Amino acid sequence: MNIYLTSGTPEFMNSLKEKHTKEKMVVLHGEGNTVLLHETTGKTVFSTPRKYEVLDSSGELNEQGYFVLNNIPVSDEGRPIFEHRFSNRARAIENEPGFIAIRVLRPIKADTYIILTEWTGPSSFEAWQTSQAYNKAHEKRGSDEGIDQRPNIFSSASYVTTYTTAKKSEDTQ
């Protein structure tokens, strides 16, 4: 499975989605930008996409939700360690209230992995961040065993981008 991302105006992203109704696409609206996400086992219809291979997934992406993309630049030598960590994740997030889906994305021609999660709304995501499941998933952060303490894994600082879909979910209104 692959995910392709492209950016443009809200109008163009919506028209592209409407043109390809048989494809699994979700329009995401963020701070000052709009992204069209295409999930497929085949080729994309985008002319200049950002390409990702899905390493791990759970749940079905929904056209009505709150998307959180944790963008993590990883060095070439750090890829095996980083991927191993995510292949052994606890999978506790799937049981959190408001959780819809997760995709762990390996970049095809770039260095930035994306951990994409979809929630019913921002309050669900924020509740997860204060949950025991979150603390368990991040318990080694900052310790000698934490992946963040290993030299040369990350090529630069990670950053988070958030998006909503055109149809507002109940707790994003």
Where are these regions (language model features)?
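Short, well-ordered beta-strand segments in beta-rich or mixed alpha/beta enzyme
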Residues: M1-S7, L28-T41, F67-I72, L105-S131
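An amphipathic, aromatic/His-enriched active-site/gating alpha helix that lines ligand/cofactor pockets
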Residues: N14-N33, T40-Y52, E94-I100, P122-S156
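A short acidic, often aromatic-flanked loop/helix-cap motif at beta-alpha or helix-coil junctions
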Residues: G32-T34, T44, G59-E60, A166-E170
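Non-catalytic surface loops within mature trypsin-like serine protease
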Residues: V74-D76, G121, T164
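Catalytic "initiation/cleavage/transfer" segments centered on a nucleophilic residue
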Residues: S155-Q173
